[in-house]
Amino acid sequence: MTSADRRRDAVARIIRARRIGTQEELLAALERAGFRATQATLSRDLARLGARRVSGPEGAVYELGADGADGADGGLAALRGLVSSIAANASMVVIRTHPGSAPAIARAIDLAQPPEVLGTIAGDDTIFVAPAGELRPRRLAARLAELLGTPSALAGEGGDRTH
């Protein structure tokens, strides 16, 4: 087991054991457990674990997806309920998400490294996904819909063209 794997295991244990509302709290708890990490590293770990902040009566806290483990999908399975729609035009795919969810979903897509994806750009609730190579955006939209468990609403008649 690598040091990164041990650190992610510690992150998962901490999130399961108590209410963690911020990354600062989580970094402090990690340090008390003997792990040093930057905020950027912690963000990547949270994405790989499929962790997300959920609102409750006492404020937002982190929770893990069903299995809380790394997966080949980069944590996409844990984020499925946060996608509102997926659409494609002739050049790109647009994913609409619940407010604040786009960065985590884009990061999970990037971590999963699907060969069909050249890259992602995320705002607060919208993600632009550029298809790799000659892949048609409509096919990429269908693949992302499959990964995210979301029906795709394919837009535009020209969505199957590569240029």
Curated annotation (Swiss-Prot):
Compartment list? Cytoplasm
- GO cellular component term of the entry, any: cytoplasm
Q: Which domain of life is it from?
A: Bacteria
Give any Pfam family that matches: Arg_repressor_C
Named from the GO MF annotations, one term is:
arginine binding
Coarse class of the primary localization is cytoplasm
- Output one GO BP term: L-arginine biosynthetic process
Q: Per its record, how is this protein called by name? A: Arginine repressor
The root-end lineage is: Bacteria, Pseudomonadati, Myxococcota, Myxococcia, Myxococcales
This chain is encoded by the gene named argR
